[in-house]
């Protein structure tokens, strides 16, 4: 932090005053400016430090002209005619450390919740172990490309300086493009930078279920502390709250409490705020307070890099020309791309053959011919799976834990994940309102079994072929 008695500080305050009065500086841009530390003046240049490349880029591009105008309005005695930017990641940590947590204040009670009597046994705040972060999703495993570069930079900046630049950070894009990965990566990176920081990841479905349970069990205090006693709240698939007025009200108060206490909120959605239906205007406006960025389908180079990274992480030996071939054939999303790699290598492992072009073409012949504009309905997947295993649809929706039914259900969940753009919570809803973690487990288990058991691999492959052929030709 700069010394307030330093002449440089006085110069910077005058620059800030001019920028504050400039209509071109939006609240979002003010967030970037708030991260700047003036360091000194040398030969007419005002040197400024920022915590990351994203902030430097914004200052040198979108804010450059207003900043030069503000410098031009200074007295000649200031001796400043230009500025230079230096990136110093250390000031992000300093800034966060210099803002201690505010004193505890009573929360405003959500109108739809009746507050229970205080229970001294309730935890005061979530522990680090309760963050619910996936250890596989870090910035080190995220592949950066033109389709996600800005979203990645924004996510890194938020982790380095929570609630300092853009709050909330709102990331939108189609399913399977890396939004959830970025949420978890923010949490992991922030924890590595600030030991003891309180981070919680939650899907909107989980938030809704917790809210409903808190009403049913008269545990509103626990619900509030779980989501409000955090330094960073990461909420996935906010569109799931569409039309859920009471849950939106609970989230509205949670958001306000965190924002008012300078705590970071990061939100993902399949649509930008202005296109979200079923939300009150006041909620959508809060989504737009900070930075809005999107992730798009990866280009060819990025798809190749994603496959290469996945092969390395799974210790799979796949020639580069094979990775390039797969990348040219699977273009829709990252999830399908990685699933294709797993299926190819599983086939090679089961047959004890090398991964070559002929093998890839054989495995993918029924997977890569479907027009990506044609969307497979999850009900078709469920119907085909039930018929294939000689079960009823109710068996797959039901609670039976017999091995035959459970395996069929897990395969159906896996195929819904692979062949549709549905989120984990929505797939869970299809299967008797199961939790999204059940879908995650099913996806992981079937992926592993395909590598180990030829019967499972053959079943998944044959089912996939039948589903796609039926979709293509319109017959069961």
UniProtKB/Swiss-Prot annotation:
It comes from the Bacteria. GO terms for cellular component: cytoplasm; plasma membrane. The keyword 4Fe-4S does not apply. It is found in: Cytoplasm. Residues 1-87 are annotated as: Domain I, interacts with DnaA modulators. GO terms for molecular function: ATP binding; ATP hydrolysis activity; DNA replication origin binding; lipid binding. Oligomerizes as a right-handed, spiral filament on DNA at oriC. Plays an essential role in the initiation and regulation of chromosomal replication. ATP-DnaA binds to the origin of replication (oriC) to initiate formation of the DNA replication initiation complex once per cell cycle. Binds the DnaA box (a 9 base pair repeat at the origin) and separates the double-stranded (ds)DNA. Forms a right-handed helical filament on oriC DNA; dsDNA binds to the exterior of the filament while single-stranded (ss)DNA is stabiized in the filament's interior. This is Chromosomal replication initiator protein DnaA.
């Amino acid at each position: 932090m700069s010394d307030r008695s330093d002449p440089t500080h006085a110069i910077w305050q005058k620059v800030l005053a001019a920028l504050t009065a400039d209509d071109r500086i939006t609240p979002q841009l003010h967030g970037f400016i708030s991260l700047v530390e003036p360091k000194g003046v040398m030969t007419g240049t005002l040197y400024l430090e920022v915590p990351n490349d994203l902030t430097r880029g914004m200052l040198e591009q979108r804010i450059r002209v207003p900043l030069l105008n503000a410098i031009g309005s200074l007295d000649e005695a200031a001796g400043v005619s230009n500025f230079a930017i230096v990136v110093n990641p250390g000031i992000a940590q300093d800034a966060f450390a210099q803002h201690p947590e505010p004193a505890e204040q009573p929360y405003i009670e959500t109108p739809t919740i009746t507050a229970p009597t205080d229970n001294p046994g309730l935890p005061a705040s979530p522990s680090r172990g309760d963050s619910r972060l996936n250890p596989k999703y870090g910035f080190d495993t995220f592949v950066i490309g033109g389709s996600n570069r800005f979203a990645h930079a924004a996510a890194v900046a938020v982790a380095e300086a929570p609630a300092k630049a853009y709050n909330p950070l709102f990331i939108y894009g189609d399913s399977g493009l890396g939004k959830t990965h970025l949420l978890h990566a923010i949490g992991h990176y922030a924890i590595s930078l600030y030991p003891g920081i309180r981070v919680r990841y939650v899907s909107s479905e989980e938030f809704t279920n917790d809210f409903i349970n808190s009403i049913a069990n008269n545990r509103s205090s626990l619900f509030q502390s779980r989501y409000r006693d955090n330094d960073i709240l990461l909420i996935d698939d906010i569109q799931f709250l569409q039309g859920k007025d009471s849950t939106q009200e609970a989230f509205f108060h949670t958001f306000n409490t965190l924002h008012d206490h300078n705590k970071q909120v990061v939100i993902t959605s399949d649509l930008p705020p202005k296109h979200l239906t079923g939300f009150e205007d006041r909620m959508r406006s809060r989504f737009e307070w900070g930075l809005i960025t999107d992730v798009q389908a990866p280009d060819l180079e990025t798809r190749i890099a994603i496959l290469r990274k996945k092969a390395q992480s799974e210790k799979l030996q796949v020639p580069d020309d094979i990775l390039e071939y797969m990348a040219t054939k699977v273009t829709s999303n990252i999830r399908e791309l990685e699933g294709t790699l797993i299926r190819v290598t599983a086939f090679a492992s089961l047959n004890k053959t090398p991964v070559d072009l002929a093998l890839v073409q054989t495995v993918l012949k029924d997977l890569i011919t479907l027009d990506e504009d044609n969307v497979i309905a999850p009900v078709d997947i469920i119907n085909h799976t039930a018929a294939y295993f000689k079960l009823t649809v109710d068996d797959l929706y039901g609670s039976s834990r017999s091995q035959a039914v459970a395996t069929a259900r897990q395969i159906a969940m896996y195929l819904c994940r692979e062949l549709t753009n549905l989120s984990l919570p929505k797939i869970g809803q299809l299967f008797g309102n199961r939790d999204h973690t059940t879908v995650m487990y099913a996806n992981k288990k079937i992926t592993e079994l395909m590598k180990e058991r030829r019967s499972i691999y053959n079943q998944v492959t044959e089912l996939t072929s039948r589903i796609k052929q039926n979709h293509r030709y319109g017959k069961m």
